[in-house]
């Protein structure tokens, strides 16, 4: 696992060159991810049909309303395709609700996640929208502190040895950034900051 956790150095606007990244555009804050990727010179497509996944090098599942996103994934027949792509080593990054979607299991057993990563997740672990906050985090693979925005965020409550913990916090206690091969999940919203280093980190995974 450690070989995938690269130190991101000298990655700026060139990070996304020669890469075509998809952002699942069924619901949620996909536009903010698109803007961040484009600032790193990546070619970006809004993904609305499963067949489009074959045309991109990696996928971001954005934050939003997890139940709605899963319902739309099933309505548009994404589930089987996403599971197949993940098993083939296709890079996927889920942020906030995207982490919930990628989980093996949820503490409240709804909605039914895709079981892409060996993690059990608690939804809304940090409270309601009014309890949103920002915290500077130390994240494995990222130089310096990262300003993480938490909005009704989930947290990982169980994981197996195949999952690399990139960052944990104390209250509530648990991982908020995890990686399993080329699958990445974060509880927080990097796309809502002016800091592109988490996106650069994902682009480095895609380039592996």
Predicted regions and their residues:
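Flexible, glycine-rich phosphate/dinucleotide-binding loops
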Residues: 30, 53, 101, 108, ...
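Cysteine-nucleophile active-site neighborhood
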Residues: 66-138
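Amide-donor transfer/coupling interface in amidating biosynthetic enzymes
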Residues: 2-15, 123-208
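N-terminal beta1-alpha1 cap of cysteine-dependent amidohydrolase-like domains
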Residues: 1-75, 80-85, 196-200, 204-208
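Short coil/turn connectors at secondary-structure junctions
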Residues: 18, 56, 88-90, 111-112, ...
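Hydrophobic anchor at the start of a short beta-strand
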Residues: 44-45, 92, 183
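Redox-cofactor binding/interface segments in oxidoreductases and associated redox assembly factors
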Residues: 61, 94, 186
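Cofactor-binding loop segments of dinucleotide-utilizing enzymes, especially the Rossmann-like FAD-
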Residues: 26, 97, 188
